[in-house]
C-alpha cells in the first residue's frame, strides 16, 4: 500500500494528485523527512485523491500524536522552525510523530 502527504508541506499544496509519497519502513509504518515551517498543516491519504483512505489529527485540527479516520479527523497542524523533521505514521497503532532531525 502507498501512503501520501497532502497539504502545505514540501511545496506540494492541497492538490491530492501532487501528494508526496511516504517511505514504507515496516508493515503499516511510513516516514518522510522535510523542512517544516511555522504554519505547517497536512493530512495523510492512502491514494492520490481525497477518497476513503484519509487520516488526520483525531477529532479535529491539532497535533495530538493520534490519527483519526475519515469523518473523525482534522488537519495535522505543526509549528516548525524551518529545520528538517521526520514525520512517522503508524497506521496500525493509530499514531504519528514529528521529530526534529
What is each stretch, according to the model?
Residues 1-101:
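Insoluble glucan recognition modules
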